[in-house]
Amino acid sequence: MTEEAMRAMALSIRSLTIDAIERANSGHPGLPLGAAELAACLYGTILKHNPANPSWFNRDRFVLSAGHGSMLLYAALHLSGYDVSLEDIKNFRQVGSRCPGHPEYGCTPGVEATTGPLGQGISMAVGFALAEAMLAARFNTDEHAVVDHHTYALVGEGCLMEGVASEASSFAGTMRLGKLIVFYDENHISIDGSTDLTFSEDVAKRYEAYGWQVLRGSMYSYTDIMDLTACAKRDDRPSLIILRSIIGKGAPTVEGSARAHGAPLGEAGVREAKKALGLDPACSFFVAPELTAVLQKRKCECAHVEDSWNELFEAWSTQYPEKRADWDAAFVPGGVSTSQLARVVCPHFEKGSSLATRTASGKVLDALCSVLPNLVGGSADLRGPNAVAVSSLRPFSAEHRAGGYCYFGVREFAMAAIVNGMQLHGGLRAFGATFMVFSDYFRPALRLAALMRIPSVFVLTHDSIFVGEDGPTHQPVETLAALRAIPNVLVLRPADAEETFEAWKIALLHRSGPVCIVLSRQNVPVFEKSDSSWRSTVEESGAYVVREGGATPELTVLASGSEVDLALRAAQLSKRRVRVVSVLCKERFEAAGDEVQRRIQGGARVVVAEAGVYQGWGAWAKREKCLVLDRFGXSGPGTQVAQALEFTAEALVEIILDWLA
């Protein structure tokens, strides 16, 4: 595309932005007005993509990390020929619109990730670039680069102030993710005013210290943008391209001020902006007519690029049928199929033996990775304690790209966002691991995964007061309830080693949201199951009967995780007809319906046993009928902490007998 055409495209982006935000009476005009030239360069020339096929695998990915500037993206997608109509633009920020206030994955063709919470977009972009590097090492040959694309992101000062951006950028530099190119819209303005108030550091030096290539130019020089992007592509380091800009450019009433950030220009402001831009104030949603032919030509060129790749892919498939078979296995819907999982042999766990569910998880993960090479992930500096140091998962590094294990370092938030990016990219099934109590560090990324309904997996060990000596800073009590409170999240808390295998199967077959696998530090026994069909029951219903309690149980204990063993001991001690139910997944159990719940519960009175707060169990039992923990723990051996808190089998017996008196 010529510079003249890109100028016309930038003008059209500004026009659509002004009118869409004014019509909605809501939005953020500052960034789209200030960065329209960049969008014109990207979508007019730089990006390797195909608007007619937004899911083409080898496309470049663009992530608008500064998601509040969504009209920049929607306007560019509309002009480029994506299935985003002018009517969609006119319905910006309206209920049911394909152009919501912030970009939403799955809502708008061409939107690669849900963004808006600042810093997470660049972090997911790191995940995209990491996935590209892994897959390129696995599938490319000297003659066939079937995985060869770049990830671009646009950030502002707000993104770079967020800690998660620092975490992810540090990781990207360490791993030398050279296919990652980040544009920094440097306008020195945030909502509160000049960034002199809040952001005095030298960003360029900071990113150089991370191991990035740093380049500088003007947002309003097409030559700068094109040349700097070409320079970035030649370097094997991630690149930060700092583009000096003016927020709200072209709108005289707000240009260069914080007033441009997050409010419509108003009738007078719109009129003045259109005059300044050389537009007719009476004309709304203007698109330069000369763009029609230019953009149609560009769209045809993009389709031809995909056609050329398809030819390359078919030649590669013919020459390397084993690699093609691995490719097909990696790209099944959801990343893992039932038939693939059927080939995984469950490790042998001796009945009556005792081991921590985190240890069992490590054995299961090793078995899974030996069959599923696209299962990848890592830990936030807890590889051993999280039991994810499995022999079948080789480390990934700047020097060794074919590995599948990521040393994320002490960067929980970035880890989760990077896992989300890897999951969005496709071709991999990704997990991240840490102590359960530190899931609070990455909760916003878990929430975005839930909002996007992507099946990121999070392995959370050290799940209760039985952590012991590390004390209450490391003993989660409120965390189970907090995780379960997020819509679309599955929380799986297995009671023993065999349930841990089932938990991983459920997690990997789940496709409509993230999964948290919650695991114990302490040993728990592998117990006999009273129902031979317990595996299918727990997969379908999230819970199953561990102890029948006779033909007509007097009372049922609902328990999860390590408290299932506690409940079994209490049932035995009570000498009453007590049924024990293991609730592996409370969300599935509660969604199973009244009939299934009654069958599993047995129609008896209910007591709950769980080493966490009462919140979330109110529909099943009153607080006084539950053995729960509504207080923090203490430092000491786990069993002694439990005794001190009266969280014991004997305490549960007392509740049971009182309830049956």
Swiss-Prot record:
Catalytically driven reaction(s): D-sedoheptulose 7-phosphate + D-glyceraldehyde 3-phosphate = aldehydo-D-ribose 5-phosphate + D-xylulose 5-phosphate
Chain sites annotated for binding substrate: 28, 261, 358, 462, 470, 521
BP GO terms, sorted: pentose-phosphate shunt
Binding-site list for Mg(2+): 157, 187, 189
Cofactor comment: Binds 1 Mg(2+) ion per subunit. Can also utilize other divalent metal cations, such as Ca(2+), Mn(2+) and Co(2+). Binds 1 thiamine pyrophosphate per subunit.
Annotated EC: 2.2.1.1
Classification via InterPro entries: THDP-binding, Transketo_C/PFOR_II, Transketolase-like_C_2, Transketolase-like_Pyr-bd, Transketolase_bac-like, Transketolase_BS, Transketolase_CS, Transketolase_fam
Pfam families cross-referenced by the UniProt entry: Transket_pyr, Transketolase_C_1, Transketolase_N
Entry binding sites for thiamine diphosphate: 68, 116-118, 158, 187, 261, 438
Active site residues of this protein: 412
Site keyed Important for catalytic activity: positions: 28, 261
Enzyme class label: transferase
Superkingdom assignment: Bacteria
Keyword vocabulary terms for this entry: Calcium, Magnesium, Metal-binding, Thiamine pyrophosphate, Transferase
Molecular functions (GO terms): metal ion binding; transketolase activity
Family matches, as SUPFAM superfamilies: Thiamin diphosphate-binding fold (THDP-binding), TK C-terminal domain-like
Cofactor: Mg(2+); Ca(2+); Mn(2+); Co(2+)
GO cellular component: cytosol
Subunit structure: Homodimer.
Family classification: Belongs to the transketolase family.
Its biological purpose: Catalyzes the transfer of a two-carbon ketol group from a ketose donor to an aldose acceptor, via a covalent intermediate with the cofactor thiamine pyrophosphate.
Record protein name field: Transketolase
Gene from which this protein is expressed: tkt
